[in-house]
Amino acid sequence: MSNLPHLRPPIVASAVLRATAAAVCLLAGAAFAPAHAADAITAGSITNSPPMISYAADGTTLQGAIVDLAAAMSLQMGRTIVFKAIPFNGLLPAMQAKNIDITFTLMNDTPERQKVIDFVDFFNLGTKLLVQKGNPQHIDGLDTLCGKTVSTVQGSTQNLLVDEADAACKKAGKAGIENLKYAQPSDARMQVQTGRAAVFFGNSPVMVYLAKTAGDGKIFDVVANREYQPVPLGIGVAKDNTALRDALQKSLNALIADGSYLKILEKHGVEGGAVKTATINGG
């Protein structure tokens, strides 16, 4: 977690494809069609949120459910997806500046974001609360955060949840919530590990994964039976690029239909977030 790298140079998904090509070919039942550089799709993403997307032990190879989905979709489309590491709050500006073609990351499809870009929804998830192992501050939902310090990722939908909880605390005559915002999820999670923050608000599959794996499961817990903001994740595409949007949707639905999509999610233990169909702007 905290030892995961921060920003890296752009990672060409073809390098990832080489590592996963055999598995993907078995899943997708399609031969890899090499893409010319001009046909590459540049995908902006945060790169430190396992098991969805993160660097492997070599520090250069991307891995995770999003990476494998991108590889399988590349096979379907015959176009290589190139991942570019960008802080979460820089993803939409990068899209607007045409520095990337898509966002393929843990970005919720929300009505507010739909005003700026279109989404191809590929996964369902919510928000869970990550706390220190043993939950020493006895966090049991949003109403127990009054007077506490929490951490979030800048620009994430979790900030809205914190704002609502803060307002509820103050309305009840209690102390508000201090929100520490960070560009990188690993930095935000570190605040919980060190005790500076009581809670990190993060995406459910990542929080569950970290609670099980960080420090062999001895660093974090998730607050049980609490999940908020059930919203789909979407691949973001510029509104004027409907051809790419529709191609992404078609490739993803093909993977859903032939079973490859579910097998990829099962490989990473996140099949609970599977969608039945890839919809456009379903959030």
PLM regions and their residue ranges:
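Sec/Tat signal peptide C-region and signal peptidase I cleavage site
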Residues: 31-37
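Extracytoplasmic small-molecule ligand-binding "clamshell" domains
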Residues: 38-106, 258, 267
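Periplasmic-binding protein-like
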Residues: 47-49, 124-131, 212-250, 268-283
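Ligand-binding cleft/hinge of the Venus flytrap
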Residues: 55-56, 71-77, 158-181, 211-215
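Short helices/loops that flank or line small-molecule/ion binding pockets
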Residues: 72-76, 84-85, 89-102, 116-117, ...
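Ligand-binding clefts/hinges and TM-proximal coupling segments of bilobed small-molecule sensing domains
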Residues: 80, 157-173, 253-283
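A ligand-binding cleft/hinge motif common to bilobed small-molecule-binding domains
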Residues: 90, 106-114, 161-165, 198-229
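Flexible hinge/capping segments at coil-to-helix
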Residues: 132-150
